[in-house]
From Swiss-Prot:
Localization in the cell: Cytoplasm
Enzyme class: transferase
Species assigned in the record: Rhizobium rhizogenes (strain K84 / ATCC BAA-868)
The entry's keywords: Cytoplasm, Methyltransferase, Nucleotide biosynthesis, Transferase
EC code(s) of this entry: 2.1.1.45
Protein name: Thymidylate synthase
């Protein structure tokens, strides 16, 4: 019997519980960490790797990916969609700069109500979307990495250079949080020879330099699989495999009880993903375009984000 692919994730957390290197990290919370991990997910039959041993709010993950693809770096448009996963960083910066003990709810309300306030305090700096869609080189030329990769997939699918990344050394200091999922590389297999009609198969490998396994990784895996499905649709290819590689993989010390609870649960079948329409470009997808069926996870497990 084939082992459920979610065990790759569960086994990694169990390994860190037993063998992780205990350290005090940037956040002050403390972690059990290790270096180097890999997970592989075969998506060729329409599966979406949304983990099932706790509920993952997949729509939030997809909305974040769609936001990245717009090139936006301000949390205002996320908040308009009821996505609050980036609020902690600008909120912490505002409290530190002003000394005001504002609540998250009041801060978000001001971001939504006051465009000038949002422009000053809601921007995250040149984070993912800026680098993916508007990377500025030393000569001042702006590069749309996503558009370039899609063009390569259409016209030179055997290339080994179909990569985009967000680790812009010259702009790291201005980012609210340097990129964790850094490098995305596409690979095309099953390429037809002249005269053949078979469909190519598109796979994606992601390198993530730093990974909060309990809270962050379930979102990352889900949204990266969705990105693969979107790009495959745009370039008329079948979906292949998602390969995820982690650098510093860690679990936070304040998540240990929650992780033990999750490890006590048995994985359930992954749901399926269907794209309900084919937009004209990668820029035109909306959350309504994604249908996830047969997702029946265990209950959610709450935990605090380390900022």
């Amino acid at each position: 019997m084939v082992r459920h692919p979610e065990y790759q994730y569960l086994d990694l957390m169990a390994h860190l519980l037993e063998n992780g290197d205990r350290r005090i990290d940037r956040t002050g919370v403390g972690t059990l960490s290790g270096l180097g991990a890999m997970m592989r997910f075969d998506l060729s039959k329409g599966q979406l790797p949304v983990f099932t041993t706790k509920r993952v709010y997949w729509k939030l993950a997809v909305k974040e990916m769609l936001w990245f693809l717009t090139g936006d770096t301000n949390i205002r448009n996320l908040l308009k969609q009821n996505v609050r996963i980036w609020t902690d960083w600008p909120l912490a910066a505002y409290r530190k700069a002003t000394g005001e003990a504002i609540s998250q709810e009041d801060f978000e309300a001001r971001i939504l109500a006051d465009e000038a306030f949002a422009e000053t305090w809601g921007d995250l700096g040149p984070v993912y979307g800026k680098q993916w869609r508007q990377w500025r080189d030393a000569d001042g030329q702006v590069h749309d990495q996503i558009a370039t990769v899609i063009d390569q997939l259409r016209h030179n699918p055997s290339s080994r250079r179909m990569i985009f990344h967000a680790w812009n050394v010259g702009e790291l200091a201005g980012m609210a949080l340097p990129p964790c999922h850094m490098v995305y590389q596409f690979h095309v297999s099953n390429l037809p020879s002249p005269g053949e009609t078979k469909r190519p198969r598109l796979s994606l490998m992601v390198y993530q330099r730093s990974c909060d396994l309990f809270l962050g990784n379930p979102f990352n895996i889900c949204q990266q699989a969705v990105l693969l499905a979107m790009v495959a649709q745009q370039v008329d290819m079948d979906v292949g495999e998602l390969v995820w590689a982690g650098g510093d993989v860690h679990i936070y010390l304040n998540h240990l009880d929650a992780i033990r609870e999750q490890l006590s649960r048995e994985p359930r079948p992954f749901p399926t993903l269907r794209l309900l329409r084919r937009p004209d470009s990668i820029d035109d997808y909306r959350i309504e375009d994604f249908e996830v069926s047969d997702y029946e996870p265990h209950a959610a497990i709450a935990a605090e984000v380390a900022v």
